[in-house]
């Protein structure tokens, strides 16, 4: 046993295929508690075989906060640190040692790096800070979906960053998310003044193609006095632009994207979206300008709103095309070469680079021929 008593707790349903991998990862804890909410496979049996304490509850109507709170209720009262975890998430080895090295009794919760998604080459794609590690007393989960930990303890709520602690997400692609929308609508009904809930609901409407509802909800979010996080406001404006683009209102989309840039000029995402809009409208000066501005930003924000595409080959690809159209062929070659280096298996990028190089060589050759002709002509007719 280490410096602190650490208990991992989770909720599950029909995740038998993840049990062994997950139990291997959380085995560094002193105790593992799992609430099974209705599995019809061998999830519960396998967890027990691996040493977890498994409890069963039927939750109707379903809410994620209710499920997580019931799971937390089974955590021993003498636990020093609670680690909320899902079975499709995997801690990297040595997480306990890193957590104990950073934790002090004065802290109420811990923040660490979460890998949400991966690139095609299996390198981390989308990463941001997560904080689902907390002390035993004073916490409850709130909101039916996109639930968060609410603190009600007497001493200050203090968070520690745990350097080197990484949690990796390996989701089940077959798992449905259809239940999210009605739960978000319920959450908005229960919390009408919560800007975070309004933002998530507006985004979910966009995901479902419910464009008018998304537009109305996101505009409502932007008017909320508590909606002050500039990066999230920028994202709401980007989502509004996506909805308007889908409705064919390109000028309206551009207006919101320029507002998004002004709202949070330190993130790449609105510049990329404006560049993509310019590409669809053949507005090559706009594309070029947005690419140039975006690439001046060299540090990711670290928030969950980060879009991997803004840090991949897309900006260089768009820059190459815009420069080609603007007859800036040398710059086009440079952008195209960088794009291909970032995505070496992309046949389209390879063909684009070949075409751009061919044009660049042709222009240089023609320029050289004209220069030679000018020199010859100068000697024959005496003109300057």
Model feature map: region roles:
Residues 44-74:
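Conserved donor nucleotide-binding strand/loop of the catalytic core
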Residues 65-73, 82, 91-216, 381:
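Catalytic-site signature of metal-activated, phosphate-bearing donor transferases
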Residues 17-20, 41-50, 94:
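Acidic helix N-cap motif at the loop->helix transition within catalytic regions
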Residues 10-28:
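Short, well-formed alpha-helical segments that are part of the catalytic scaffolds
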Residues 25, 35-48, 59, 86-89:
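A conserved acidic beta->alpha catalytic loop
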């Amino acid at each position: 046993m280490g410096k602190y008593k650490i208990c991992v707790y989770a909720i599950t349903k029909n995740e038998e295929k993840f049990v062994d991998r997950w139990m291997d990862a959380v085995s560094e804890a002193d105790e593992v508690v799992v609430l099974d909410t209705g599995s019809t496979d061998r999830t519960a049996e396998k967890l027990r075989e691996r040493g977890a304490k498994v409890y069963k509850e039927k939750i109707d109507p379903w809410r994620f906060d209710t499920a997580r709170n019931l799971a937390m209720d089974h955590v021993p009262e003498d636990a020093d640190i609670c680690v909320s975890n899902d079975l499709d998430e995997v801690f990297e080895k040595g997480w306990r040692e890193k957590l104990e090295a950073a934790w002090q009794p004065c802290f109420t919760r811990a923040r660490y790096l979460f890998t949400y998604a991966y690139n095609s080459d299996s390198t981390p794609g989308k990463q941001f800070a997560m904080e689902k590690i907390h002390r035993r007393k004073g916490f409850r989960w709130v909101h039916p979906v996109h639930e968060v930990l609410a603190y009600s303890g007497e001493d200050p709520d203090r968070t520690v960053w745990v350097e080197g602690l990484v949690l990796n997400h390996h989701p089940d692609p077959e798992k449905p998310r259809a239940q999210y929308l009605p739960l978000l609508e319920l959450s908005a009904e229960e919390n009408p003044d919560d800007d975070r809930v309004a933002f998530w609901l507006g985004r979910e409407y966009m995901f479902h193609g419910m464009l008018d509802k998304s537009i109305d909800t996101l505009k409502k979010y932007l008017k909320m006095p508590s909606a002050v996080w500039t990066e999230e406001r920028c994202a709401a404006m980007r989502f509004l632009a996506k909805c308007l683009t889908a409705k064919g209102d390109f000028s309206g989309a551009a207006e919101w994207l320029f507002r998004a840039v002004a709202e949070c000029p330190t993130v790449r995402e609105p510049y990329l979206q404006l560049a993509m809009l310019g590409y669809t409208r053949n507005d090559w000066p706009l594309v070029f300008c947005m690419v140039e501005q975006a690439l001046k930003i060299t540090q990711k924000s670290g928030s969950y709103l980060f879009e991997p595409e803004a840090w991949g080959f897309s900006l260089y690809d768009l820059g190459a095309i815009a420069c080609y159209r603007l007859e800036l062929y040398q710059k086009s070659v440079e952008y195209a070469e960088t794009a291909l280096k970032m995505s070496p298996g992309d046949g389209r990028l390879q063909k684009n680079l070949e075409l751009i190089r061919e044009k660049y060589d042709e222009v240089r050759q023609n320029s050289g021929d004209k220069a030679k002709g000018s020199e010859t002509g100068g000697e024959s007719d005496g003109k300057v």
